[in-house]
């Protein structure tokens, strides 16, 4: 059986964030669109349609671009935890998300936030949001609970 590997592209956002795009053929999945403009620029430059949005947690630097993206791609589903108002599909530990011939396992990884999610694509690529930072662990806040970690 032929396995097609998607292209994964980081898009810098703000001063220290990344928005992730997973693309295959003429479609893309966007993870944590904190800003819409760089995502729209990339999609238009590459002739892509936005098929899905996956959100790791409810902080604005990961969600602020959702509304504008939905204006351009109105039928695009948004996957995330129940505390994300824009989520059209609530995902929990053990769920999976299907897209084209790919599957992402959903992990509940509380710590940075109580309802944080990570997505493991095809058992190979882990999208952690703020559970992990580049060259280090993610940040927790004073109101974080030890049982989250």
Located regions from the model:
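Metallo-beta-lactamase
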Residues: 1-3, 23, 27-33, 46, 113-149, ...
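Active-site-proximal loop/helix segment associated with metal-binding centers of metalloenzymes
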Residues: 15-17, 25, 135-136
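Core dinuclear metal-dependent hydrolase active-site scaffold
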Residues: 20-23, 96-122, 126-127
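Active-site HxH/HxHxD metal-binding segment of metal-dependent hydrolases
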Residues: 14-15, 28, 33-107
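Short, hydrophobic/aromatic-rich segments at coil-to-beta transitions
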Residues: 5-10, 103-105
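Short beta-strand-initiation
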Residues: 6, 15-17, 92, 114-116
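Short Pro/Gly-enriched beta-strand edge/turn motifs at strand-loop
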Residues: 1-6, 78
């Amino acid at each position: 059986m032929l396995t097609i590997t998607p292209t994964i592209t980081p898009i810098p956002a703000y001063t220290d964030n990344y928005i992730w795009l997973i693309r295959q053929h003429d479609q893309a999945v966007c993870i944590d669109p904190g800003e819409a403009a760089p995502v729209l620029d990339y999609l238009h430059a590459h002739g892509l349609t936005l098929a899905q949005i996956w959100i790791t947690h409810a902080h604005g630097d990961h969600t602020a671009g959702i509304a504008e993206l939905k204006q351009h791609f109105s039928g695009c589903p948004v996957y995330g935890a129940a505390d994300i108002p824009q989520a059209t599909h609530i995902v929990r530990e053990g769920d999976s998300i299907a897209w084209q011939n790919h599957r992402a396992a959903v992990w509940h990884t509380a710590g940075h936030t109580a309802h944080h999610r990570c997505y493991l694509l095809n058992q190979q690529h882990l999208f952690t949001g703020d559970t992990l930072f580049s060259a280090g662990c993610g940040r927790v806040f004073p109101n974080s609970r030890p049982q989250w970690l």
